[in-house]
């Protein structure tokens, strides 16, 4: 088991698109939290990949994607079957967020594990239309070797120390994410 190392990690945001988000349980909550995480990661100069599955049919990502992020339109369910592998390839660790847990997220995680990556699935930043699908997907991904984490685990592991220059902004993000969760519960 490993702790997230920001120098060896990339973050993958899967298919948070206009026609999909409203159909998924807690889709708007997940998208809102992902939007804030992505903005913070952009300030951290993190390796970020955003995928859109059949964008012509499902629409674009529901929030602004920073120019520094790699944006990939895909048709395969697995996000690494297409161009996003270019950014992910040099990174040993991949943090995964997105939709749907049992479809594109699941197949991506399985392919990442097969490629010998350390995979961290952010349980409060993945979603499916039916909660049973999310639950089953998380169980299978964990059994296959993925580490199931929360957004707070990701952030505190990313920073690791109160003396880190990004600690203050990370703590503000944690507080904001807690407010968002409380408002939507």
Each predicted region: which residue ranges?
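Active-site loop/turn elements of alpha/beta-hydrolase fold enzymes
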Residues: 16, 53, 124
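N-terminal nucleotide-binding beta1-loop-alpha1 segment
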Residues: 10-16
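Short connector loops/turns at beta-strand edges and beta->alpha or beta->beta junctions
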Residues: 16-19, 115
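Active-site-adjacent betaalpha module
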Residues: 2-10, 43-44, 56-185
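A positional/architectural concept
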Residues: 19-24, 28-50, 55-66, 71
């Amino acid at each position: 088991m490993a702790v997230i190392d920001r120098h060896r990690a990339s973050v993958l945001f899967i298919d948070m698109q206009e026609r999909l988000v409203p159909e998924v349980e807690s889709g708007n909550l997940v998208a809102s939290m992902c939007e804030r995480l992505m903005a913070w990661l952009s300030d951290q100069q993190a390796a970020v990949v955003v995928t859109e599955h059949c964008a012509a049919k499902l629409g674009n990502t529901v929030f602004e994607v920073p120019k520094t992020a790699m944006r990939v339109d895909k048709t395969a369910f697995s996000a690494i079957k297409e161009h996003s592998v270019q950014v992910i390839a040099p990174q040993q660790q991949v943090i995964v967020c997105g939709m749907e847990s049992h479809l594109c997220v699941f197949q991506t995680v399985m392919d990442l594990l097969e490629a010998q990556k350390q995979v961290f699935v952010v349980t409060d930043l993945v979603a499916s239309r039916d909660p049973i699908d999310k639950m089953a997907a998380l169980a299978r991904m964990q059994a296959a070797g993925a580490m199931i984490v929360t957004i707070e685990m990701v952030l505190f592991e990313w920073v690791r120390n109160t003396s880190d220059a990004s600690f203050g902004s990370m703590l503000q993000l944690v507080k904001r994410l807690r407010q968002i969760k409380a408002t939507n519960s």
